[in-house]
From Swiss-Prot:
Cross-referenced NCBIfam families: nfo (TIGR00587), PRK01060.1-1 (NF002196)
Superkingdom of origin: Bacteria
GO biological processes: base-excision repair
GO terms for MF: deoxyribonuclease IV (phage-T4-induced) activity; DNA binding; DNA-(apurinic or apyrimidinic site) endonuclease activity; phosphoric diester hydrolase activity; zinc ion binding
Name the UniProt record assigns to this protein: Probable endonuclease 4
Keywords: DNA damage, DNA repair, Endonuclease, Hydrolase, Metal-binding, Nuclease, Zinc
Name of the coding gene: nfo
Cofactor binding note: Binds 3 Zn(2+) ions.
PANTHER family in the cross-refs: APURINIC-APYRIMIDINIC ENDONUCLEASE (PTHR21445:SF0), ENDONUCLEASE IV ENDODEOXYRIBONUCLEASE IV (PTHR21445)
EC number(s) on file: 3.1.21.2
Amino acid sequence: MVKIGSHVSMNGKKMLLGSSEDAVQYGANTFMIYTGAPQNTRRKPIEELNIEAGTEHMKANGIQDIVVHAPYIINIGNSIKPATFELGVNFLKNEIDRTEALGAKQIVLHPGAHVGEGAEKGIPKIIEGLNEVLDPNSNVQIALETMAGKGSEIGRTFEELAQIIEGVTHNDRLSICMDTCHIHDAGYNIVEDFDGVLEQFDKIIGIDRLKVVHVNDSKNERGAHKDRHENIGFGYIGFEALHNIVHHPQLSDLPKILETPFVGTDKKNKKPPYKHEIEMLKEGNFDPHLKEKIMEA
């Protein structure tokens, strides 16, 4: 059975229990959460995350291999502002503690941005930060995400990610999250030659490091370096290629996580597409009228 889910929120009093309930409603058997708002550092204490009730609900409903995503504000690639780097290191340590408490094994991290100083300065800074953060005795791995190459993002090529991994002391605590929109926007031809892309990944990084897949279509043509997610089948990657990736035999054990946009033009009335997209990807049938159906439901 394919391991597929989506990003779900974790908030209110229910916290982890609410996340699991949403995932089950979507027909998922895994999910990804932020431990709080991705744009800030405000977090509830671990004892208020409702972990016990959430874990029981997950077990009862066959949910496993959940994933945590670190917030966007962490940038350990910043070599200009020491305060930004230190904030990133300290907050990431706390996020790993929360990830472990939640029972997740993977925390996805955008590697960082060099803020105009060039990858030759950003990459050593990321290595320095990861060396401060990683605990060889932890059960959690940091899954470095493949990036689209927007702005000064680092991680736009497999080579950049490999360079980071090679520089880190306890790099057995590092894994990779492959985002389909990001690698498409970075220039990799996943539409016509996903097997070739995987082969390249295996040679440069090693397929064993791949632990999470973000399944997103793209609003942009290959190589655009934009990072704008589109709903499954409505973008430049297309349904067939994404269905192939979700069901690829080399990725069968990995959680596939949808981060596609909510549907609707009215900002106050947008609806999650995940139940419908998960169903489409499981069954292999693309519905070109999906967006209208979601809004009519």
